[in-house]
């Protein structure tokens, strides 16, 4: 990790974005599967 001040590393952005997307999809599918399909 060399001098990434002022710029966010691309791998960090990808990791955070991927985690958020997977989390949202997981919550959505879990809600739909549990019968709480009105979670939109």
UniProtKB/Swiss-Prot annotation:
Keywords for this protein: Chloroplast, Membrane, Photosynthesis, Photosystem II, Plastid, Reaction center, Thylakoid, Transmembrane, Transmembrane helix
Cell location: Plastid, Chloroplast thylakoid membrane
GO CC annotation: chloroplast thylakoid membrane; photosystem II reaction center
GO biological process: photosynthesis
Record-annotated membrane-spanning stretches: 10-30
Membrane topology: Single-pass membrane protein
Quaternary structure annotation from Swiss-Prot or TrEMBL: PSII is composed of 1 copy each of membrane proteins PsbA, PsbB, PsbC, PsbD, PsbE, PsbF, PsbH, PsbI, PsbJ, PsbK, PsbL, PsbM, PsbT, PsbX, PsbY, PsbZ, Psb30/Ycf12, at least 3 peripheral proteins of the oxygen-evolving complex and a large number of cofactors. It forms dimeric complexes.
Family (UniProt): Belongs to the PsbJ family.
Name of the protein described by the UniProt record: Photosystem II reaction center protein J
């Amino acid at each position: 990790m060399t001098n990434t001040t002022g710029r966010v590393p691309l791998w960090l952005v990808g990791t955070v974005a991927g985690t958020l997307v997977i989390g949202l999809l997981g919550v959505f599918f879990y809600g739909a599967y549990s019968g709480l399909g009105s979670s939109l």
